[in-house]
């Protein structure tokens, strides 16, 4: 028995020694980050030893970190959460930082953010948030509210998300800085991205969503170019708001092809200040909402499409439409040299197109039978198929199928006339001239070119016998005696009178001869 016990003890000791000799595959207790396999007790220690390398989180950790100027690192969240030290920002970047992985960067203190950037940051993954946010509306911070991201450098977002539920603070402030959104999601209850004084915002992809009634997906006080992605207002707020409070910080916004704006657009001065004109231009993209120009706004709609209404809310607000397509008539805001026409099914709604006369002619000529065309403005000369109703409600000259169109309108028709050969009339049967008849519209024409319209009666040649049977006497030759006279009696009386006159004449002649 003792022999077996000693044997088992020897085996256990051997196994222990073998295990000690194996390379470590687990994480040392208390270490929270690693760089190239080397573990560190704090994330900051890992950052300080990771220039040009990747810091990987090994656990959830409460710690605030700073990336020094001139330093370049990648922070892989590794599925864990980095939460701030009390009363500090979670990450302060003065160098070059890439955030990646599926974890979170959180801040839980009032007046502090998950990321404050003074250098260059690429957000490729993860979630940046403020999980203890208490702001409920524009007047109530709840004692714990701030931006999730405060940018004073350059941020390029290619993935991940920045999310909060604040009704008091903007999600991202971009002030004197550049924010490039290529992919990823930004979402907040209030203002999502506040492009502040001298800020530059370039959006080529991704989503920016406001969920509150007082929110704005993008509030632009600087320069913003939207050429892709989606700005969205889902809770009754504004998808895109352009403002200006001081003309030295000019607000310039451009919406280009590829952009989608799901919600209303509002362009105006800050009501508490008197500033210069706010430039807002749409050259492409889709706006699923209203476009309103307020005080100081200079809105130019040169392309794209708008599904809502156009309007101004102040005398100083300017809105000019020179291109694009619209669900409601833009007639009130058309540029002087623009042509415009509405096209849709007869009795239905129309889509209104604005552009050069040549562009609108091309649009109009796509109309088919059963369509209605209303020309709002411009001189147009088009060829249309049968069955298109056209009205000219503007002051331009509109020619359709070589015929002028006025406010009374026309329904287009292409005559398909058949020639009817001439037929001689007989004594008893009427004939006809040669003519052309269009069965489609029931019209008659005297020439092959169909330029001389005639009536059906004009085609008839009366039967020859009809002329011979007409009475020679004219009305009123009968004596007015109360009844019809006998023609033979009157003839006899006339004969006797003639004989008597002749006898008298002969007697007078003999008398003159005798003398």
Question: Can you annotate each of these PLM segments?
Answer:
Residues 55, 65, 73-75, 89, ...:
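Solenoid scaffold repeats with emphasis on beta-solenoid/beta-helix
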Residues 499-515:
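C-terminal membrane-anchoring or membrane-association module
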Residues 21-32, 477-490, 506-510:
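Sec-dependent signal peptide cleavage junction
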Residues 79-87, 100-111, 124-145, 157-169, ...:
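Beta-strand-rich solenoid/repeat architectures in extracellular/passenger domains
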Residues 49-62, 73-80, 363-381, 389-394:
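Glycine-rich repeat segments that build the extracellular carbohydrate-interaction surface of secreted
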Residues 410-411, 454-485:
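C-terminal low-complexity, Ser/Thr- and acidic/Pro-rich disordered "stalk" regions positioned immediately N-terminal
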Residues 62-74, 82-100, 107-121, 137, ...:
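Extracellular beta-strand-rich solenoid/capping regions of secreted or surface-exposed proteins
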Residues 30-58, 346-374:
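Acidic Gly/Asp/Thr-rich repetitive segments characteristic of extracellular carbohydrate-active
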